Amino acid sequence: MLILAALIGFLAGFASTAFRWMIEFFGIVFSTKGLSWLGITGTALPFLLPLMPMFGGIVTGIICHFFPDAVKENGVHRVMHAVALKAGKIRKRTLITCSATSALTIGSGGSAGREGPTVQIGSAVGSALGNLFHLSRERVRVLVGCGAAAGIAASFNAPLAGVLFALEIILGDFTIHTFSPIIVASVIGTATGRALEGNEITFHVPVHELVSYSEIILYLFLGLLCGLVSRLFTLVYFKSNDFFEEKVRIPKILKPALGGLIVGLISIGFPAVLGNGYDFMEKALSGELLWSMAFLLIFLKIISTSVTLGSGGLGGVFAPSLFIGAMLGSAFGALVHDISPNLTASPETYALVGMGAVAGAVMQAPLTNILMLFELTNDYTIILPIMITCIVSAYTFRGFSKNSIYIQKLLKEGINIQHGREV
C-alpha cells in the first residue's frame, strides 16, 4: 500500500505541476504576447484584453458541450461524492477534460483557483491505480485521498496541508491506516513538485508579529467579519449558479462566454479580479493597497468568482477565498492601524490572517487552512492570531450553515455526505 502511495505521489505530483504549466501557457496565449502572435498590436490591445475571459469561455463552452463529464465530474465535491458513494471510482478521461477546461478558464482570466481541479486530477490518478490493481473499496478510497494530498502538496508546495486536506475534507478519516499512505504520497508529491518547479514559497511576506496581547480582541472581531463575508460569498455563489441555470435563456454552450464577458468588463476598471489574483494578494501582503481599494475588491471578487463559476467556467474557490480574506484583512488592518498605530500590527499582518480565516470558513476546514497559510508564506510568527481568527470565522459561518461550500453543492443535488460517508 505504501509503495502504491509513493507511486501515486509521484504521478499526481507530476500531473498537478503539468496543470500549473497549462494555466501559465493559456495565460500567455490570452495576453498581449498571445495577441502579438496573431499580429495584433498597438491600439487594438486595450479593447481586446478585457475580452480574453469571454474567448476562454467560448472554448470552454465548446469542450463542455462535447464532453459534459468535464462539468459533471469537476470539483472537490465530486471527489467527495466518488469517495462516499462510488467506491472511489473517478473516470480517467476527467484528467484531460478537467485539466483543459479549468486551465482555459483560469488562464484566460476567469476568476477561479486551481485547487479544485488539482484535487480532481490527483484523485483521478489514485482512483485509476486502485482500480487497475482491483483493490478493495476501502483501499481505493485511501488511494484517492493519496492523490488529492499529493496534488495539493505539489501544486502549493505544502505537504502538511496536503495531508490535512485529504483527511479533513476528502475522507473525513484520521485513522492510522489512512494517515500513513497519505503522508507518503504527500511527501513524494512535494518532492516531485520541487524537482520540477523549485522549492519556492507562494507568497513572499515580511516578518509579522503580535504587537500586544490586547490585539487578540481585534483578531476576534476580524474572525467575526471573515465569517460573515464567507457566508456572503457562498450565498452569492449559489445565487449566481441558480441565476445562470434558471434565468439566463441562452444556449448552455454560450453561458461560460457570457460569464467571461461580465468578468472582462469588470476588469477594465479592476484588473485584480482576473485569474487567481495572487499578484494582488502579494500587494496586500506588502502593504501596497489603499484600504478603500481593498474593501471594494472584496465584493468585486465575490461577484467575479460567482459569475465565472456560476456561468459554467471551471476552477476552485480556494484562491478566491484567499483573495477575499486578504482584501478584508488589509482594509480592516489599515483602519485599526490608523486609529491605534502603536498598539496594532501593520495592515499586512491582518491581510495574512484574513486569508486563512475566509478560506477556513468557506471550506469548513480551519486546521487545513492554518497549516496551508504557514506553508504558503513560510511565516510561523503569528500563530496565535491565525489560530483564533480561523476558528472564530469558521464558527461564525456555522451559525448560518453547518456545511462547507462543497457539502452545500452536494446537498443541492440531494446528496448528504458527512465524514466521507453518506448520511
Q: In which residue ranges do the predicted regions lie?
A:
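Alpha-helical transmembrane segments and immediately membrane-proximal extracytoplasmic
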Residues: 1-423
